[in-house]
From Swiss-Prot:
One of its GO terms (biological process) is response to stress. Pfam families: MarR_2. Changing residue 153 to E: In strain: EFB1. Changing residue 92 to D: In strain: EFB1. It comes from Rhizobium meliloti (strain 1021). Gene3D superfamilies: Winged helix-like DNA-binding domain superfamily/Winged helix DNA-binding domain (1.10.10.10). Transmembrane segments: none annotated. Residues 49-184 form the HTH marR-type domain. This is Exopolysaccharide II synthesis transcriptional activator ExpG. Keywords: Activator, DNA-binding, Plasmid, Transcription, Transcription regulation. It comes from the Bacteria. GO terms for molecular function: DNA binding; DNA-binding transcription factor activity.
Amino acid sequence: MERGMNHRILYPFADFGDTVAILPANETQRKGLDTPVDDRDGDDSLVTYFELARVMERASRRFSGLLRAELTKLGVEDIGPAQAMVLLAIGEAELSVGELLDRGHYVGSNISYYLKQLADGDYIDRIASQRDKRSARIRLSEKGRQLCAGLRQAAKGYERALSHGDQDRRNLETAFQTLHRLELVWGNAARYGI
């Protein structure tokens, strides 16, 4: 890996041992490697699914910390990052609890707790269903909309810092698509096996 980023700078505490660098096809030909990169055994890959899952978990924790810091900057002390993500999942929609569960892939007991906190803090409005008085629809209150707007504004700053052109935006889109595909595959594997 003569060109490109130094992985020791990006991952200073990682031990890559004897890992194989995955090079683009034109790099493979220049280096004289006989085996195409895509045909190599899965054990030789630079990243395993477990390593990817660990990075995703760390990124999730870092994002949660960042979200907590943004909530503090906005003067919000009564809810945490998980509840803020529920507000963002609701967005401009009016949803039933079941629809919110599907949209955010939440656990039922967690969402009930989050919704109670959000209702107690006046971040959401609960509207009783006309057809079934036992069920309710949920939407953001004005306070919830203002908080979401503040969080979206803060997110734009991070997006500008991360995106320096079309290639960065395409890379972000590719990363999103890949992570979404992994979510679907892993979810189906957990439910139905492979």
